[in-house]
């Protein structure tokens, strides 16, 4: 769902009134805002001649503050479902994205519910980093009057499963808040747990808070949207609801699939263009494209042969009956393994090597990460039946790719930049599920199921004069191609600076001709390139950032927005450390002050990351 505000000329407020309103509401807590909402409603509905009096206004409702800390959209969707449940139960609720939450108001919360996803190696979702850091700082207040509940979303294929949810739960309790419910840690297949938890939350809150006698108030904290249309005001605009979603994707067509790395490159990167037709599907620079895919039929046949299964065995997936081969092809995950699957398979196969592996957690994590299910079966044979096999495997999930185009230029197309995952295990070639599908199996003009995952935490600045610093090595360059297309079409006068890196200049300079044109035409003000393998010593984008520290600080002082896209585990952490060092050195700050400064940039949406 996308929301666009009407032009200022259509608002029932003058620009001066709108400015005063926006300045005034910034001082109020969510609870106070909820009370004011009811107060103004009462003013509007008074009988003619009646005199409004705050003294006789109804007492402020007890509001449930619901914080969504989402990375890929799942936490946000769950929070929205819970919001609807609470409203249906006549409970006042304030749904807010973690990135928009004024966390210094947390001491005023009485009922707090957090839905938190985890990214990378146990880190909070990008929009929740500032809140997480605040709660773990010395500034966090005691919360003796707060009751809370936490639902954690994660992936058991990662070592630090649901760590962000665990962090929020333990820290809130440490600060003196009381648990309404025990924390829930949910895996990729979280829907059943989520539904049960939603019911428990509603029942618990209904017992704790009486239903409001008037219509429940729902105040949604304003999103600091950076799109020009939405920057003026976030309510009262027109809303366009797309019929397409993760569960109801658009069937589009592949129009272009082109390798954009050289023939001698160690990397296989593809530029993909998808025709959206007349679907009306809309996206913005910074959004991601969700891609549903089928597994490799050869991989399905290999697995069936290893288990001595025919593929025509009847199985049930989400209540739908189908042959086993069809379930393996289109409904079950085959290219990603988890420690939980290894654990269960070890018990079923009684393989001594796998059983011994369970006692060594680091080795188990490494094995699950590097050994797909089919290769585990080959290494530790067993005689699973069809139902046992289906019970072991996780449901297939779509992959998200940062969009590499702006509809201001490409109109009914969407572009993505895909790094194809390729590797060998025991001499057998393997490829990634979605990347292999896009590069090797999907034909041009073939159908592909897609949807848009909106990301309001990675947006161009509203002011076209604002300078932009883009840091995106490898396929992390994708959203910055979209950014530059948008800035060029908008005629944005703000300066643009790109940091890009890859192994070799001659083989791995993605979209080289386009960047050279942007530089020649003055759209791209600066470009700094890091080629890690073109000389004896390795050079990365973080080295270029440090080298340009003084100028980088000048741009920041001029109000530049900083964007980082790419690998979360190493690159993004290294880049952030260099940014801290640059701020400390050129801003004459100590480490703590530099950290606080960068946090302030993040809260002001001047430091945004799209990392994975």
Swiss-Prot record:
Boundaries of every Flavodoxin-like domain copy: 64-202
Q: For this protein, what is any one GO molecular function term? A: sulfite reductase (NADPH) activity
Q: Which UniProt keywords apply?
A: Amino-acid biosynthesis, Cysteine biosynthesis, Electron transport, FAD, Flavoprotein, FMN, NADP, Oxidoreductase, Transport
Catalytic EC class: oxidoreductase
Enumerate the residues binding FAD.
Answer: 335, 369, 399-402, 417-419, 423, 432-435, 612
Report residues binding NADP(+): 532-533, 538-542, 574
Essential cofactor(s): FAD; FMN
EC number(s) in its UniProt entry?
A: 1.8.1.2
Q: Which InterPro entries match?
A: CysJ, CysJ-like_FAD-binding, CysJ_Proteobact, FAD-bd_FR_type, Flavdoxin-like, Flavodoxin/NO_synth, Flavoprot_Pyr_Nucl_cyt_Rdtase, Flavoprotein-like_sf
Q: Where does FMN bind?
A: 70-75, 117-120, 153-162
Q: Which biological process terms from the Gene Ontology are attached to this UniProt entry?
A: cysteine biosynthetic process; hydrogen sulfide biosynthetic process; sulfate assimilation
Q: Can you quote a single GO CC term? A: cytosol
UniProt pathway annotation = Sulfur metabolism; hydrogen sulfide biosynthesis; hydrogen sulfide from sulfite (NADPH route): step 1/1
CDD domains registered for this protein in UniProt: SiR (cd06199)
Q: How is the cofactor bound?
A: Binds 1 FAD per subunit.
- What is the role of the protein in this entry? Component of the sulfite reductase complex that catalyzes the 6-electron reduction of sulfite to sulfide. This is one of several activities required for the biosynthesis of L-cysteine from sulfate. The flavoprotein component catalyzes the electron flow from NADPH -> FAD -> FMN to the hemoprotein component.
Protein family membership: Belongs to the NADPH-dependent sulphite reductase flavoprotein subunit CysJ family.
Q: Which PANTHER family match?
A: NADPH OXIDOREDUCTASE A, NITRIC OXIDE SYNTHASE-RELATED
Family annotation (NCBIfam families): cysJ, PRK10953.1
Return the protein name. Answer: Sulfite reductase [NADPH] flavoprotein alpha-component
Q: Which organism is it from?
A: Yersinia pseudotuberculosis serotype O:1b (strain IP 31758)
What gene name is listed for this protein? cysJ
């Amino acid at each position: 769902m996308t929301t666009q505000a009407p032009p200022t000329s259509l608002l029932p407020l003058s620009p001066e009134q709108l400015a005063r309103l926006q300045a005034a509401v910034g001082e109020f807590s969510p609870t106070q805002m909820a009370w004011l909402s009811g107060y103004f409603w009462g003013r509007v509905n008074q009988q003619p001649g009646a005199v409004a009096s705050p003294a006789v206004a109804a007492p402020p409702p007890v509001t449930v503050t619901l914080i969504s800390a989402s990375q890929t959209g799942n936490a946000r969707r769950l929070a929205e479902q819970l919001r609807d449940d609470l409203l249906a139960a006549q409970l006042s609720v304030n749904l807010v994205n973690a990135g928009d939450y004024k966390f210094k108001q947390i001491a005023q919360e009485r009922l707090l519910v957090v839905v938190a996803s985890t990214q990378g190696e146990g880190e909070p979702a990008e929009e929740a980093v500032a809140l997480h850091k605040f709660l773990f700082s010395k500034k966090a207040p005691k919360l003796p009057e707060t009751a809370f509940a936490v639902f954690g979303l994660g992936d058991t294929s990662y070592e630090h499963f649901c760590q962000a949810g665990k962090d929020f739960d333990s820290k809130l309790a440490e600060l003196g808040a009381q648990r309404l419910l025990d924390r829930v840690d949910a895996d990729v297949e979280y829907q059943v747990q989520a539904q049960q938890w939603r019911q428990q939350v509603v029942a618990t809150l209904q017992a704790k808070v009486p239903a409001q006698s008037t219509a429940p108030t729902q105040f949604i904290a304003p999103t600091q949207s950076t799109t020009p249309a939405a920057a003026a005001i976030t309510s009262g605009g027109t809303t366009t609801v797309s019929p397409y979603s993760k569960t109801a994707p658009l069937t589009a067509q592949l129009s272009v699939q082109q390798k954009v790395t050289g023939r001698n490159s160690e990397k296989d990167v593809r530029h993909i263009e998808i025709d959206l037709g007349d679907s009306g599907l809309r996206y913005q620079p910074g959004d991601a494209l969700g891609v549903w895919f089928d597994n490799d039929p050869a991989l399905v046949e290999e697995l069936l042969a290893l288990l001595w299964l025919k593929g025509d065995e009847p199985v049930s997936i989400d209540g739908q009956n189908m042959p086993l081969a069809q379930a393996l092809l289109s409904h079950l995950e085959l290219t990603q393994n988890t420690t939980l699957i290894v654990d269960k398979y070890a018990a079923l196969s009684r393989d001594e090597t796998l059983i011994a592996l369970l006692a060594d957690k680091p080795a188990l994590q490494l094995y699950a990460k590097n050994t797909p299910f089919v290769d585990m079966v080959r290494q530790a044979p067993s005689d699973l039946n069809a139902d046992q096999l289906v019970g072991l495997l996780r449901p297939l999930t779509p992959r998200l790719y940062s969009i590499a185009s702006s509809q201001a230029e490409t109109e009914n197309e969407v572009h993505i930049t895909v790094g194809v995952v390729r590797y060998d295990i025991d001499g057998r070639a393997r490829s990634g599920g979605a990347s292999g599908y896009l590069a090797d199996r999907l034909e041009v003009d073939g159908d592909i199921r897609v949807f848009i995952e909106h990301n309001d935490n990675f947006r161009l600045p509203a002011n076209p004069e604002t300078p932009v610093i883009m840091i995106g090595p490898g396929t992390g360059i994708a959203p910055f191609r979209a950014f530059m297309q948008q800035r060029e079409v908008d005629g944005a006068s703000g300066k643009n600076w790109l940091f890009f890196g890859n192994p070799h200049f001659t083989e791995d300079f993605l979209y080289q001709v386009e960047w050279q044109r942007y530089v020649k035409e003055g759209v791209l003000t600066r470009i700094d390139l890091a080629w890690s393998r073109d000389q004896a010593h390795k050079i990365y984008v973080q080295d270029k950032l440090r080298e340009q520290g003084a100028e980088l600080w000048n741009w920041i002082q001029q109000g530049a927005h900083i964007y980082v896209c790419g690998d979360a585990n190493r690159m993004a952490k290294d880049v952030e450390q260099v940014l801290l060092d640059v701020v400390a050195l050129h801003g004459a700050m100590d480490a703590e002050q530099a950290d606080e400064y960068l946090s302030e940039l993040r809260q002001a949406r001047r430091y945004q990351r799209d990392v994975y």
